[in-house]
Regions:
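S-adenosyl-L-methionine
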Residues: 1-57, 87-126
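A generic secondary-structure signal
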Residues: 44-52, 72, 97-100, 104
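Conserved beta-strand/loop positions that form the S-adenosyl-L-methionine
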Residues: 62
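Conserved SAM-binding loop of SAM-dependent methyltransferases across substrates and taxa
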Residues: 66-78
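Conserved SAM-binding motif I beta-strand of class I
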Residues: 80-85
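S-adenosylmethionine
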Residues: 128-129, 133-141
């Protein structure tokens, strides 16, 4: 199942990330908040990667969780992204976070990004991937 930000539900509860700009709140599913990458860390990573020359293609996060890191990459690099999340509630939260970041004035590439509910360890040979994000803080996920 694939989710797009245009279909996101923003009505659920949100939590403010103290490192995010004023008014930018995020959705989390169940116990996902303690695992979420803080916005400031996500943006700094994206700024570092933005300095690199990447080939054409998407940003792929095969274990996207709340989607905050994926949203930061797409926002800062102006690239479409695909996040894959095994847990359905967390995937819906990630999709809502893509829309929230897009609505906060970041790059429109977020609107073209999507979240897939599924197993990120199963490759999709149709994707042209410019960058694969694997969170170094969670090497076993």
């Amino acid at each position: 199942m694939e989710l797009t930000p245009s279909e996101a539900d923003l009505s659920g509860p949100t939590i403010r990330d103290s490192t995010a700009p004023e008014g930018l709140h995020f959705h989390y599913a169940d116990e996902a908040k303690p695992l979420a990458t803080p916005w400031q860390v996500a943006v700094e990573r994206a700024k570092m990667v933005r300095k690199c020359s990447l080939p054409k293609g998407i940003i792929l996060d095969p274990a996207c969780g709340s989607g905050i890191q994926l949203a930061a990459y797409c926002a800062m690099m102006g690239r479409e992204g695909i996040g894959i999340e095994l847990d359905e509630l967390t995937a819906h939260a990630a999709n809502s976070n893509l829309l929230r970041v897009s609505n906060h004035g970041y790059d429109s590439a977020l609107a073209d990004s999507r979240i897939r509910i599924g197993d990120g360890t199963i490759a999709d040979p149709t994707l042209k991937v410019a960058m694969l994000h694997l969170d170094p803080a969670r090497p076993r996920n």
